[in-house]
């Protein structure tokens, strides 16, 4: 059996930013039932159990949102606990998370290092490009906070990469 990859959306479309191009927030505002809430620990356990029951060799578990860090470190600690509990086939498990990076702190960084997470941070260019699209609900840019958190990830030794959105508008904004 080929390696299994699973995408978990623990926060549904919930997010602490209001990015101009994000379809989650726009879609949620138009649905009869906006957000479906946060994934329960019971559902997480069921997903991990089922995924690992069918995994052979290796398995990648990726988390994204919305903003997955809104689910909190305890949610992700439970995921690691369930991975250890249900890994009866002794598969190699890779964990990854895609985040806007705004909620990261030292505790998150230490968790990522301790549990060997690959962290994708969304950063859309320099301050003008990034802040043009990635704003707080109050309309303020998020670039400075994201860059501070990227520096903290570096210092802590977190394995991370950058995911960027590019558009003609971004190209026309001078850094």
Set out the residue ranges of the language-model regions.
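Radical SAM/AdoMet-radical enzyme domain recognition
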Residues: 48-49, 53-62, 71-175
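Canonical Radical SAM [4Fe-4S] cluster-binding loop centered on the CxxxCxxC motif
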Residues: 2-39
């Amino acid at each position: 059996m080929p390696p299994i990859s699973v995408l978990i959306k623990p926060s549904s479309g919930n997010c602490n930013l209001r990015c101009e191009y994000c379809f989650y927030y726009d879609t949620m505002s138009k649905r009869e039932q906006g957000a479906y809430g946060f994934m329960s620990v019971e559902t997480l356990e069921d997903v991990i159990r089922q995924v690992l029951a069918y995994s052979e060799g290796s398995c990648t578990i990726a988390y994204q949102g919305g903003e997955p860090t809104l689910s909190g470190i305890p949610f992700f600690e439970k995921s690691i606990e369930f991975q250890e509990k249900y890994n009866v086939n002794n598969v190699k498990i890779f964990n990854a998370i895609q985040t806007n990076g705004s909620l990261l702190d030292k505790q998150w960084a230490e968790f990522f290092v301790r549990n060997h997470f690959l962290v994708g941070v969304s950063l859309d260019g320099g301050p003008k490009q990034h802040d043009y699209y990635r704003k707080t609900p109050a309309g303020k840019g998020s670039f400075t906070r994201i860059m501070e958190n990227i520096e903290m990830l570096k210092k802590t030794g977190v394995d991370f990469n950058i995911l960027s959105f590019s558009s003609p508008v971004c190209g026309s904004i001078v850094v």
